[in-house]
From Swiss-Prot:
Alpha-beta TR is a heterodimer composed of an alpha and beta chain; disulfide-linked. The alpha-beta TR is associated with the transmembrane signaling CD3 coreceptor proteins to form the TR-CD3 (TcR or TCR). The assembly of alpha-beta TR heterodimers with CD3 occurs in the endoplasmic reticulum where a single alpha-beta TR heterodimer associates with one CD3D-CD3E heterodimer, one CD3G-CD3E heterodimer and one CD247 homodimer forming a stable octameric structure. CD3D-CD3E and CD3G-CD3E heterodimers preferentially associate with TR alpha and TR beta chains, respectively. The keyword Plastid does not apply. It comes from Homo sapiens. Pfam families: V-set. This is T cell receptor beta variable 5-1.
């Protein structure tokens, strides 16, 4: 009886499909070499005008990069000038890193808010 119930629960979960998180970040995965340039894109939740970017290097907590609100940079973390960003009139945002260095290997996240 127990294994039948577990199989049923798994089948129900598989049928549920993916849950949309709201914020879309592209590309999802990226591999670059030292010296190259990278651009990441973030589409916020509909109606959100603020977009923030974060970096998380292996074994470390999130580090704030910058925040944009209505196309204007409001806050900036303590990062080199190789890190830059912008926000468009539709609230979509891009983060750029020029001349990549080995220490730039990290998880980059964007978040949106009202």
């Amino acid at each position: 009886m127990g294994s039948r119930l577990l199989c049923w629960v798994l089948l129900c979960l598989l049928g549920a499909g993916p849950v949309k998180a709201g914020v879309t970040q592209t590309p999802r995965y990226l591999i670059k070499t030292r010296g190259q340039q990278v651009t990441l894109s973030c589409s916020p939740i509909s109606g959100h005008r603020s977009v923030s970017w974060y970096q998380q290097t292996p074994g470390q907590g999130l580090q704030f990069l910058f925040e944009y609100f209505s196309e204007t940079q409001r806050n900036k973390g303590n990062f080199p000038g190789r890190f830059s960003g912008r926000q468009f009139s539709n609230s979509r945002s891009e983060m750029n890193v020029s001349t990549l260095e080995l220490g730039d290997s990290a998880l980059y996240l964007c978040a949106s808010s009202l």
